[in-house]
Amino acid sequence: MIIFNISALGPPKPMLQFVGRELVETSRATMLRLPIDSAMHPFSTLPNHELGLYIMWMMSAVFVIFKLLAPAKCDIPTVNGRRRFEIGQYQARRRFSVDGRGIILNGLQMARVFRVVSQKGPKIILGPEYANEVKSHPACNADVFIAKEFHAHVSGFEVLRPQQVMKDAIRLRLTRSIGALMKPISAETALILESQWGNSNCWHELDLNFTIASLVSRVSAVMFVGEELGRDQKWLSIVTNYSSDMFVADLDLCKWPEALRPIATYFLPSCGKLRRHIREAALMLYPILSEGYSAHQNKQNFLDWLEEIAGDRKYNPVLAQLSLAAAAIDTTSDLIIKTLTDICRFRDSQKLQEDLREEMVRVLRADGWEKSAMYNLKLLDSVLKETQRVKPVVVFGMGRYVTEQITLHDGTVISKGETINVVNTRIWDPAVYPNPLEWDPYRFVRRRDSGDHAAHLVSPTPDHMGFGLGKHSCPGRFFAATKIKIILCHILLKYDVKIPDEEISTVISSGNFLFPDSTLRISVRRRQDNLTIWD
């Protein structure tokens, strides 16, 4: 059952609700209870903004005073707490923003369980030895963590609310349809590269972050909503901007006490952008959903899979699409950008590129665009996993909300209501990976050839949690890995690539994150491949 509200898109109109494929009117009182409704309510209708702001600031002051006077929790040490003469956590948060990775690594030298004051507030950090214990503990809830960490109860952030229908659609439809999607992914990639990268055999520069994000967002959108909407620049702008704007809005909202965030969201321009993106996405999906997606396009897609899987369960297709896009675009783009820069800056880049091309041609000629080809691209798989190891998206992950007091295997007690994360630092441990700071593109080929089944990109372990761990590991990782490999096959077989400025850092550390440098550029020129493997 599809439900979404388009009531705030203009002058007052009857409320509209999808029940199956039928659009019916419903009362405003009913719609106020729907998940999307809070994103459609402009706070500007409240009578007195100045009074509201005054009340909020007074409540904030009371909250801050209460927190300052409250006794500090001292059972678990804090490694970057307040220093002498500091009031509040502002400076501690700022220090974490500048050197989060260093603070985490230093903390692990002091204790295996400790607190940090992050940009998003205090949290408990566990060493990697706790990963297997935490991943399946019934009192460690991942969905509640995501909802609390990303304000899913706050207007504009509804996209982060858990939707089991979407998880089921990914697991039962998307993953099982990878084989059928490979040729469409390849065809769309070819179209985009020809239009954006061109066919010139002369070197020319491109903004690496922009061009990869554009490519990934369109390929993903075409797979998720079909060719017509997936190629629409307005739709692509909505889904890509929602993700980037959410990161900014998240940090803005974290500056407010948690209890006041549902109110503060209406005064923050960054949060207003999120509500606008949701409204615009609803407007664009409305014609397709009202007509019936299969009637609109002559083949099934993720919209249809959601409807099939949902059955009588209620879900919101707008939130589902924005959530899917946020998960698919950022992490996929991140890994492609980092991998390309690692390939270009490898000490013997030319040989590595030729080795990759030789493997791609051999495998694709033998298997074509089939799932077996993705399995047999061993060197490409190794290159991707090595980049994810050396330059992960985050230093700590496996976020969990503790729903009741737990005692870990070593006697450590974690209280109910705490937020915990497990660090991914074994990826830099010389006892696990010799020369861990060296990017070795052949590392996981050797491990795989020696019988290490965990050497595959999509195989998460406590030693390499790039896709999480356990039942909450990324459900879309198989689709993401396939999409990334197809895109890189097109890029490396069709273009010579190099990074023009050797002095620019490839990764910027900010808090828990390792971002690709936003100023990175890539030089490309068309190769004369004359290959016949693209059909």
From Swiss-Prot:
It comes from the Eukaryota. SUPFAM superfamilies: Cytochrome P450. Its cofactor is heme. Keywords: Heme, Iron, Membrane, Metal-binding, Monooxygenase, Oxidoreductase, Transmembrane, Transmembrane helix. Belongs to the cytochrome P450 family. It is an enzyme of class 1 (oxidoreductase). GO terms for cellular component: membrane. It is a single-pass membrane protein. This is Cytochrome P450 monooxygenase ausR. The chain crosses the membrane at residues 51-71.
